Amino acid sequence: MEQFISHTGVGVPLRRSNVDTDQIIPAVYLKRVTRTGFEDGLFARWREDPDFVLNQDTYKNGSILVAGPDFGTGSSREHAAWALMDYGFRVVISARFADIFRGNAGKNGLVAAQMTEEDIELIWKLLDEQPGRTMTVDLEERTVTVGDAVFGFDIDDHTRWRLMEGLDDIALTLRNEDAITQYEKSRSPFMPRTI
């Protein structure tokens, strides 16, 4: 997983609340056996509408999604985080995330930055004033900067640390490789190996 310290990219205003994982990536797109190639399924039903925000040239290279509250609700689909990342998003900002989406995002390198609804409304206003505007998300400082405006966001300390270190579950486990190896050496040879 790639380290995330800060990212500057085009902000995409998604003025929708209660965006569940089936809206993020419909079930028909979940048939792949790999973790990549899900970008075509991202918001597939909504992208049928030519006026949908991701169909606008201004936002085609967007990498920071600014969504309404209750993002990522519904069933547990790690594919939702994969689809967002495959499309090019590095950050999703919302007032509330489903716990399971927040966990899946962090484990896959996608920042789920939680802010107040009032701050999100202000960011949407700034993005409307200048479509295609860039924003900066600084994970170290826990800030989002749009022009001269700076907003704070919440993210739990452990997820923040993992993202800044670039540690997925496997890399996190391998930090204990010496202890695991010592444990394996202490086990009877007839017992199965754990790694």
Curated annotation (Swiss-Prot):
GO cellular component, one term: 3-isopropylmalate dehydratase complex
Keyword NADP on entry: no
Keywords: Amino-acid biosynthesis, Branched-chain amino acid biosynthesis, Leucine biosynthesis, Lyase
Pathway: Amino-acid biosynthesis; L-leucine biosynthesis; L-leucine from 3-methyl-2-oxobutanoate: step 2/4
Phylogenetic placement of the source organism: Bacteria, Bacillati, Actinomycetota, Actinomycetes, Mycobacteriales
Assembly and binders: Heterodimer of LeuC and LeuD.
Keyword Transcription found: no
Function: Catalyzes the isomerization between 2-isopropylmalate and 3-isopropylmalate, via the formation of 2-isopropylmaleate.
GO function terms (MF aspect): 3-isopropylmalate dehydratase activity
EC number(s) stated in the UniProt entry for this protein: 4.2.1.33
PANTHER family per record: 3-ISOPROPYLMALATE DEHYDRATASE SMALL SUBUNIT, 3-ISOPROPYLMALATE DEHYDRATASE SMALL SUBUNIT 2-RELATED-RELATED
Entries under CDD domains matching the protein: IPMI_Swivel (cd01577)
The protein's name in its UniProt record: 3-isopropylmalate dehydratase small subunit
A Pfam family matched in the record: Aconitase_C
Catalytic activities: (2R,3S)-3-isopropylmalate = (2S)-2-isopropylmalate
Naturally occurring in which organism (per UniProt): Corynebacterium kroppenstedtii (strain DSM 44385 / JCM 11950 / CIP 105744 / CCUG 35717)
Family, as annotated: Belongs to the LeuD family. LeuD type 1 subfamily.
BP term (GO), one: L-leucine biosynthetic process
